[in-house]
């Protein structure tokens, strides 16, 4: 399987600043794994949108996949209680 390239939406950098450092390391590791498998076990396609989400502790990572370009765009990172608002 080909490796996907990871890109971040500009607003994700603001989301990252809100995440505690201990959780941030785990989130970054989880995002890096998306390059090898953008649809890992436990990922879920969001209803009505071309977005996927993966869980990392109490945080959710929302992203889109472009299979033709082999890219993954991280759209949003946030706490599970706030991410879908």
Task: Walk through the language-model features, giving the residues of each.
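Enriched for short, Lys/Arg-rich terminal
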Residues: 1-25, 40, 56, 64-85
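A short, surface-exposed loop/turn module that caps and links secondary-structure elements
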Residues: 29-54
């Amino acid at each position: 399987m080909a490796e996907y390239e990871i890109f971040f939406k500009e607003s994700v950098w603001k989301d990252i600043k809100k995440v505690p450092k201990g959780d941030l390391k785990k989130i970054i590791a989880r995002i890096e794994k998306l390059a090898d498998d953008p649809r890992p076990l436990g990922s879920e396609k969001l209803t009505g949108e071309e977005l996927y989400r993966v869980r990392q502790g109490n945080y959710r990572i929302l992203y889109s996949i472009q299979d033709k370009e082999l890219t993954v765009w991280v759209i949003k990172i946030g706490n599970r209680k706030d991410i879908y608002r």
